[in-house]
Amino acid sequence: MNCSPPGSSTDTERQSSSSGTPATPCPTLAPTHPVRQANRLPIRLINMLTAHTGHLLHPEYLQPLSSTPISPIELDAKKSPLALLAQTCSQIGKPDPPPSSKLNSVTSSEKESGRSSSLKLGESPLEDKSSFKPYSKGGETRKESGSSAGGSADKAGFRVPSGSCQPFPHAPSPSSRVSSPGQHCDSKNNESQEKKEPEANKGSLETSQANPTLTRASISNSSAESSQSGDVTPSSKSDPPSLGSGHVAPVSPYKPGHSVFPLPPSGIGYHGSIVGAYAGYPSQYVHGLDHTKTSLVGNQLPGTLGLPGKPPSSSPLTGASPPSFMQGLCRDPYCLSYHNASHLGSSSCSTCVHDPSALKSGYPLVYPSHPLHSVHTTMSSSVTPSLSGHPLYTYGFMLQNDPVPHICNWVSASGPCDKRFATSEELLAHLRTHTALPGADKLLAGYPTSSFGSAASCHLHLPPGGPGSPTTLPGSLSLRSPHTLGLSRYHPYGKGHLTTPSGLPVPSLPAGSYYSPYALYGQRLTSASALGYQ
C-alpha cells in the first residue's frame, strides 16, 4: 500500500496504524497533523479511565468493622469537634457506669474491669470528660455527685456502708433510695453481680449521676421524711406507695409520673380561689376546699410530708431541702411555687405559731382591679369577697373572718415583707418605713398640687421624712415598687395613664388604693400560671 498523502481518508490511516508494520516506508506524521489530532482521546478521559479508586474511599470504610464493639469515635482519636458531638449524642438515654468504682477507693484492676464493663454496654470510659453534663461543675463531676449524695445521707442519719464494702446500685423505685444503700454489703457484691444489675437500674442511675442537684434534694427530702422512725436500718424496707406524691423524685425518661418539685398529695385539693384567681374565674365556681375550714394546705402538707415537730403554719419545705435547693425556689409571693404556705386560711387557727417567718403569706393573690381603681370597692370593711372589679383580680380567696386582709408586698434583698394589717392606713404607714428616695422632695416639688404630691408619695412609697430620715434604706429599691417610680421610662404594656404627670389631676386617689405593678401584667401572669409556667 502506498503511503497516503496528507489529505487522504482516515480509514487508510487506521488500517496502517492497526497493522503491526507499515506496508511501505512513509514519513511519520507530525503531532499537530489533523489526522492524529482527530484520533486522540482527551487527557481527562484517560485519567478517569485509568485512575485507581483507592484514594477516594479509605480502607476503614471499605472493610467491615470488627465483631468487638468498637466505638466509631475512636477512629478520630476523640479530638475532632464532630467526634465530640457524636460522643455527646451517643450518651443520651444511656445510664452512667456503675457508681461503685467512683464512690470508693478501689484498686486499679477493679477500675479496669469497671471500664471494660462500661464499654461492653456501649458507653464512654470513666475518665472521659468531653460529654456535656449540665449539672456538673468541672473535673470531679461524677465523684462529687456520688460523694455528695453519700455525705448528705450521712448527715440525715442513714447507715451508709463502710469504705471497704461496695454499695449496691440504687434500685429503680425511688423508695429504695431511702432504705437500701446498705442491704447488699456482703461478699456476693462483686463485679459479676454488678454487671447483671445495670439493665434494671437505667432510670435511676442516669438521673442520680447526671443530676446531682436533684439527687441531693431527693435524698435530703426523703431523709427528713424518714426521720420519724429514727435511723433507717438495712433490713427496713418501705413500699413505694408510702412515699406519697409529695416526694421530691428526679425525673427519669424511663419512669413517667415523678415530679421534680414537691406537690401536695392527691387527697388535698387546692383552695378554690387559688384556681379561681389564677384562671380568671370566681372562686364560687371552683369546688376546692371549704372556706370555713381552718385546716387547709398549710396545715396538711407538713403532716403528709412526714415532718415531725413542725407547727401547722410552717412551710412544708422548711428543713426538708438543702439551702441550695431552697434558693432555687421562687421567692415571689405571687408565684405558685412560693414555699411559705402558712396563712392560707389559717388566720383563725389557735395552734399556729405566729413568728415572723410563719407570718409570711403563702399565696397572697391580692391583684387589684386596676392601678387607678379604688381598692375600697373590693376591700370593704366586712371583707366580703366582692366581684365588682375585674373578674381576673378577685378577692374570693379571703376568709370572711380574716382580721388582717391587707398585706405588705414589699420585696427587699432579704426577701418579701408580707406583713398583714387590718386597715389600709396601717399598711401605708408601714410602707413609709421601708425606704426613702434621696431627693424625694425635689421630685415632688415639680408637681402642681399638694394633693398629687400626697398621692405620689403614697404610690411611690416616699416617706415624709425626706432624705435625712433615719428609715432611709439606700439600695433597697423594691422589685415590686410600682411602675410610677420611673415616670419617664417606656412601659410597653402600660396604658399610658401616668405618662404626663404634670397635667394629670389625681385628687380622687384615696389613701387606701395601694396597688401592685403586677396589675399591669396580671393578664400575662394569670395565663402563664394557669399553664404552669411559674
Curated annotation (Swiss-Prot):
PROSITE patterns: ZINC_FINGER_C2H2_2 (PS50157). It comes from the Eukaryota. InterPro entries: Elbow/Noc_ZnFinger, Tscrpt_rep_NocA-like, Znf_C2H2_type. Residues 15-34, 115-124, 146-155, 218-229 have a biased composition (Low complexity). It holds the Pfam family nlz1. GO terms for molecular function: zinc ion binding. The keyword Aminoacyl-tRNA synthetase does not apply. GO terms for cellular component: cytoplasm; nuclear matrix; nucleus. Keywords: Cytoplasm, Developmental protein, Metal-binding, Nucleus, Repressor, Transcription, Transcription regulation, Zinc, Zinc-finger. Residues 185-200 have a biased composition (Basic and acidic residues). It is found in: Nucleus; Cytoplasm. A zinc finger (C2H2-type) spans 406-434. Disruption phenotype: Morpholino knockdown blocks differentiation of the neural plate border (NPB). Residues 1-35, 90-251, 300-320 are annotated as: Disordered. The keyword Membrane does not apply. Residues 173-182, 204-217, 230-239 have a biased composition (Polar residues). GO terms for biological process: adherens junction assembly; negative regulation of DNA-templated transcription; negative regulation of homotypic cell-cell adhesion; positive regulation of cell migration; regulation of canonical Wnt signaling pathway; regulation of cell cycle; regulation of transforming growth factor beta receptor signaling pathway. Transcriptional corepressor which does not bind directly to DNA and may regulate transcription through recruitment of histone deacetylases to gene promoters. Regulates cell adhesion, migration and proliferation. Involved in specification of the lateral neural plate border (NPB). May be required for segmental gene expression during hindbrain development. Belongs to the Elbow/Noc family. This is Zinc finger protein 703-A. It comes from Xenopus laevis (African clawed frog).
